[in-house]
């Protein structure tokens, strides 16, 4: 039986111990801050990137990993005896990373199945972790691909932003439907679905977020949850408030983590994401 390994990109928000335990390969994106290039993997310390972004003269710019880095990553895995690679990446609505991964696989001439997770952050983690667990347990490539697709189809990702400034400056506002770019200081909740950010609600103050969540939980209370996660940019207080509200409906552990530099660049400070995988 061959060896299958899972590759993903650093837009994933995941506990470091899981990466190690499941032997997941994470290819880093890059962030340019005031003409200095940082590897996303070097910005994982809590609050580090946000402090750099707040002090920068202009909005940081993210860039996908070079094609050559993907090619090198895949070649190195094959040299170690890996027979199949499954690469799971963030939505093309947010980055061209998936295309760089495909091109890297072609250059390396290695057996790579490149998948669009449809998401990013911890919603992508749901797929990556399950795939890695299955690979370790000796599942076949087809079994892993089927499981990843099933998880993707049952996952929902909701993003709340406190300012649209980063989305506007980063050129992502065109992919956010139903929002006037002039309303920069409005609170907005969006869903990432079918590689598009779609506005659900907008308003003033954090009550916009809590009211949306209460309504969402009530409407979906009949649906059994497999796992749920919350990510945040900046202070954790809002994320912890949301966690308390979710706990009334879901009595299992809820992962609350700071999102990485790639997502924070797009969302700005004060943002959060609620990600749910249903049974």
Curated annotation (Swiss-Prot):
Name the Gene Ontology molecular function terms of this record: lipid binding
Q: Report the Gene3D superfamilies cross-referenced here.
A: 3.30.1180.10, 3.40.50.10170
Residues binding hexadecanoate are 62, 95
Q: Name one Pfam family in it.
A: DegV
What keywords would UniProt list here?
A: Lipid-binding
The DegV domain is annotated at: 4-278
- For whether the record's keyword set contains Chaperone, the answer is no
Record has Transcription regulation as a keyword? no
Note the coiled coil stretches, chain numbering: none
Q: Which NCBIfam families match?
A: DegV
Q: In UniProt terms, what function does this protein have?
A: May bind long-chain fatty acids, such as palmitate, and may play a role in lipid transport or fatty acid metabolism.
Query: Which named protein is this?
Result: DegV domain-containing protein SpyM3_1149
Could you tell me which species this protein originates from?
A: Streptococcus pyogenes serotype M3 (strain ATCC BAA-595 / MGAS315)
């Amino acid at each position: 039986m061959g060896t299958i390994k899972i590759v993903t990109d650093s837009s994933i928000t995941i506990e470091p111990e899981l990466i190690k335990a499941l032997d997941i390969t994470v290819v880093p994106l890059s962030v340019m801050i005031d003409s200095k290039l940082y590897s996303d993997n070097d910005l994982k310390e809590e609050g580090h990137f946000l402090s750099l972004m707040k002090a920068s003269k202009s909005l940081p710019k993210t860039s996908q990993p070079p094609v050559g880095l993907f090619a090198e990553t895949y070649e190195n895995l094959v040299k170690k005896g890996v027979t199949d690679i499954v690469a799971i990446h963030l939505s093309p609505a947010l980055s061209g990373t998936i295309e760089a991964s495909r091109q890297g696989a072609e250059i390396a001439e290695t057996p790579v199945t490149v998948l669009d997770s449809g998401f990013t952050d911890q919603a992508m983690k749901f797929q990556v972790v399950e795939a890695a667990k299955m690979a370790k347990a000796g599942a076949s490539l087809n079994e892993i691909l089927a499981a990843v697709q099933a998880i993707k189809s049952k996952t929902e990702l909701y993003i709340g932003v406190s300012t649209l400034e980063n989305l506007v400056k980063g050129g992502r506002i065109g992919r956010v439907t139903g929002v006037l770019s002039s309303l920069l200081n409005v609170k907005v909740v969006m869903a990432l679905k079918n590689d598009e950010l779609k506005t659900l609600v907008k308003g003033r103050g954090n009550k916009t977020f809590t009211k949306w969540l209460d309504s969402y939980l009530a409407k979906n209370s009949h649906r059994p949850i497999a796992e749920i996660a919350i990510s945040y940019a900046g202070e954790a207080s809002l994320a912890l408030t949301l966690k308390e509200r979710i706990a009334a409906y879901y009595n299992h552990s809820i992962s609350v983590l700071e999102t990485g530099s790639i997502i924070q660049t797009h969302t700005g400070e004060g943002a959060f994401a609620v990600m749910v995988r249903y049974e």
